[in-house]
Every structure is written in C-alpha cells, then in structure tokens.
C-alpha cells in the first residue's frame, strides 16, 4: 500500500488530532476530505475504526478491522481492534478465537496477551486468564498493571485472587 501524501496525510493527521481532542464530528469531516482512492488506506480505516468505537458501532468496527486486515495483515492493531469489537459486541469467544492465532506472530505486543487474559476471564477460564496476564506483564509490567487495575473484564480473575491481581507476579 502506498503511503498517504499531502494533502491526504494532513487530513488524516488533523482527524487524529480531533479524535484526541474528543471532537468526532470534526474528525469525520477531515476523513471525508481524503481523496476517494485513499479512503481504503489502512491508516484512514484505523481512524474510522476509532470513530466507530467511540460511537459503540461494534459491527461496523469489525467490518473496518477486517478491511484493514485484508490490506495489511502484519498490522497488530487491526487484529486487536477486530477482537475488541467482537468482544464489545458480546461475541467474546469469537474475539478470543480470532486473536489467539496471532499471539505468537506479534510476541512484543503486550495488548494481545492482555486482551486474551480479559477474554478468558469473561469466559470463566481463570487459570488461562492468569497465564495470559502473566505473559502481558513480562512484556510491559507498568503499563499492564495500570490497564488492569480497574478493568471490568478482569473482575472475575481479580475476585478469584481475593480482590488483587498482583499476587500473579509474586
């Protein structure tokens, strides 16, 4: 896939800025300014995924992530985004099944084992959840601890450990 060039790259960056500021309407307007031949660029689609996620349009997010994966299967965020959208659409087993095959393809991405831990916890597979969370902690302990501190998806695991997750690493 060819890189986005100005002015399309500028519109994408502006859209990302608006997303960071929480202004979805302006972000969408900037994305609409991108030339039609680049509307399917993976970076543009990822920005559209974030808009859909903010609107909780999970089926749309699954479709967008699938489109990114068709164009760039080596992009770990596309795998993560698809599974996250499936989970939010109450299709947690499918989210797990879609993310598991790439866990070893992207061994340095902490979000993959972390999300697998969340999905396992929600599916009642607490030992498996614990194993995945340990794997995520090895990759980026400070970030994982911060993310997990109040993550409702990890509540079943937290409760099984007496309310605290951190005995996992001790």
Language model features by range: what are they?
Residues 5, 39, 73, 106-107, ...:
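Short coil turns that delineate tetratricopeptide repeat
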Residues 1, 143-170:
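Terminal, low-structured helical/coil segments at or just beyond the last alpha-helical repeat
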Residues 121-122, 126-144, 170:
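TPR/TPR-like (Sel1-like) alpha-helical repeat modules
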Residues 43-111:
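Alpha-helical adaptor scaffolds
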Residues 42-43, 76-77, 110-113, 139-150:
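Boundary/linker segments of alpha-helical solenoid repeat arrays
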Residues 20-21, 54, 88, 122, ...:
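Register position in tetratricopeptide repeats
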Residues 4-54:
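Alpha-helical segment of the N-proximal tetratricopeptide repeat
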